[in-house]
């Protein structure tokens, strides 16, 4: 959530910066609510001053033995009016809050201005895409003989679900373990096992609600008036970041660096017809997430560090990739700045997103009321960052395609072999 003081001080400037993100702020609605709020607050202050004055007058009158009933009745009337004003003010504050809940974060000044992904800027590349001397297969054709089972996944759960069997399932698990081990042993993150089902207010904290309810899977328990609504997490960023919700941490605890391996559940409501083949876009997929909770003066250094941590995974796996800075029109709702890492997918002859690392500055912290004590001992909002380290399913796709062999086997990247008991190749089992 944006700091409302920014809008009060420079509504036109904020509106312009939001327009760069493709969001049109309802300036008239905000200004009207603000005018109403100021009028009520001014009237309340006037009533308070008058009541204080009359209360002093009553004391003096009693000292002189005078009748105070008329003045006391007037004070009572003022009290009633103040109560009514308080109700009005609470309603206006809620309407202002509801308006702000739908407003995205402001982009950092270093973010390129653009309307969509065409405005993104490439930062660097690593690795050289392999030149194949045989016809490239996509991960579906490579993986199906090795244990990818789309047919059974669809039978069990419908479209965009996949069943993994045998050596493919083991490779998938190895990838996640390798990522977690790297982040905890080399990058200083603490591993966390989080709930996969969270309460609605948790999603308000990280920005998925109220704006993106259609992207979430909702679950209900109980029935009738006792129904309780909760949501499946779309990323463990949600649960990891909210661990500091409604709390004040000591500055010496920062940075807090957390990582988790979890399934993620997304309805893909806006992706109809996109990536319908294979594992690129699924309703359920695994991801290793990185979250950092830091002081404001270190958050952009932390963002660069987080990107480097995700890059280490790709480099250890020997997967070519590129890093891009997302433009204003392509960033996520909560982000102030985002880098995407895109891995080379040979069958598509292009790079595809495999990690997204974002600094949300104080946007999520304000919604969560997550603070730390600064050098002066005063509570101040933390900055929160999140990044994929990496999306496990898409990494599996990249390994299958980049390490495929002409005979249908897949060479196991050296970094993963210790997790597979030394196995260096996945091979198609001969039919009986």
UniProtKB/Swiss-Prot annotation:
Keywords: Aminoacyl-tRNA synthetase, ATP-binding, Cytoplasm, Ligase, Nucleotide-binding, Protein biosynthesis. It catalyses: tRNA(Ser) + L-serine + ATP = L-seryl-tRNA(Ser) + AMP + diphosphate + H(+); tRNA(Sec) + L-serine + ATP = L-seryl-tRNA(Sec) + AMP + diphosphate + H(+). InterPro entries: aa-tRNA-synt_IIb (IPR002314), aa-tRNA-synth_II (IPR006195), aa-tRNA-synth_II/BPL/LPL (IPR045864), Ser-tRNA-ligase_type_1 (IPR002317), Ser-tRNA-synth_1_N (IPR015866), SerRS_1_N_sf (IPR042103), SerRS_core (IPR033729), tRNA-bd_arm (IPR010978). The keyword Isomerase does not apply. ATP binds at residues 266-268, 353-356. SUPFAM superfamilies: Class II aaRS and biotin synthetases, tRNA-binding arm. It is an enzyme of class 6 (ligase). Its EC number is 6.1.1.11. Pathway: Aminoacyl-tRNA biosynthesis; selenocysteinyl-tRNA(Sec) biosynthesis; L-seryl-tRNA(Sec) from L-serine and tRNA(Sec): step 1/1. It is found in: Cytoplasm. GO terms for molecular function: ATP binding; serine-tRNA ligase activity. GO terms for cellular component: cytoplasm. The keyword Hydrolase does not apply. One of its GO terms (biological process) is seryl-tRNA aminoacylation. It comes from the Bacteria. L-serine binds at residues 235-237, 289, 388. Its main location: cytoplasm. Catalyzes the attachment of serine to tRNA(Ser). Is also able to aminoacylate tRNA(Sec) with serine, to form the misacylated tRNA L-seryl-tRNA(Sec), which will be further converted into selenocysteinyl-tRNA(Sec). Consists of two distinct domains, a catalytic core and a N-terminal extension that is involved in tRNA binding. Homodimer. The tRNA molecule binds across the dimer. Belongs to the class-II aminoacyl-tRNA synthetase family. Type-1 seryl-tRNA synthetase subfamily. NCBIfam families: serS. This is Serine--tRNA ligase. It comes from Paraburkholderia phymatum (strain DSM 17167 / CIP 108236 / LMG 21445 / STM815). The lineage of its organism: Bacteria, Pseudomonadati, Pseudomonadota, Betaproteobacteria, Burkholderiales.
């Amino acid at each position: 959530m944006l700091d409302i003081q920014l809008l009060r001080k420079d509504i036109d400037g904020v509106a312009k910066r939001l327009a760069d993100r493709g969001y049109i702020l309802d300036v008239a609605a905000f200004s009207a609510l603000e005018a109403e709020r100021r009028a009520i607050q001014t009237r309340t202050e006037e009533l308070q001053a008058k009541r204080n004055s009359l209360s002093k007058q009553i004391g003096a009158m009693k000292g002189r033995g005078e009748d105070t009933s008329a003045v006391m009745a007037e004070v009572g009337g003022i009290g009633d009016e103040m109560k009514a004003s308080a109700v009005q003010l609470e309603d206006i504050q809620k309407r202002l809050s509801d308006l702000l809940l739908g407003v995205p974060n402001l982009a950092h000044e270093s973010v390129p201005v653009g309307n969509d992904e065409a405005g993104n800027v490439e930062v660097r590349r690593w690795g050289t895409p392999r030149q194949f001397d045989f016809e490239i297969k996509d991960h579906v054709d490579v993986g199906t003989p090795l244990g990818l089972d789309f047919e059974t996944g669809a039978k069990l759960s419908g479209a965009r679900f996949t069943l993994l069997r045998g050596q493919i399932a083991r490779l998938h698990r190895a990838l996640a373990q390798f990522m977690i081990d790297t982040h905890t042993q080399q990058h200083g993150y603490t591993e966390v096992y989080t709930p996969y089902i969270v309460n609605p207010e948790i999603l308000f904290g990280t920005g998925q609600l109220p704006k993106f309810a259609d992207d979430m899977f909702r679950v209900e328990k109980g029935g009738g008036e006792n129904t309780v609504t909760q949501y499946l997490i779309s990323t463990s960023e949600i649960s990891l970041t909210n661990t500091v919700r409604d709390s004040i941490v000591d500055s010496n605890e920062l940075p807090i660096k957390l990582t988790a391996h979890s399934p993620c559940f997304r309805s893909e409501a806006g992706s109809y017809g996109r990536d319908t083949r294979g594992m690129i876009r699924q309703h359920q997929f695994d991801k290793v997430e990185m979250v950092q909770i830091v002081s404001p003066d270190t958050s952009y250094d932390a963002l660069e560090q987080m990107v480097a941590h995700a890059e280490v995974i790709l480099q250890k796996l020997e997967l070519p990739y590129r890093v891009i800075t997302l433009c204003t029109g392509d960033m996520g709702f909560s982000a102030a700045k985002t880098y995407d890492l895109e891995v080379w997918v040979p069958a598509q002859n292009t790079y595809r997103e495999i990690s997204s690392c974002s600094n949300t500055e104080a946007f999520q912290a304000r919604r969560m009321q997550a603070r730390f004590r600064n050098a002066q001992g005063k509570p101040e909002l933390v900055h929160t960052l999140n990044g994929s380290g990496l999306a496990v399913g898409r990494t599996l796709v990249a390994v299958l395609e980049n390490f495929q062999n002409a005979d249908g086997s897949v060479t196991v990247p050296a970094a993963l072999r210790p997790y597979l008991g030394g196995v260096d190749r996945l091979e198609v089992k001969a039919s009986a």
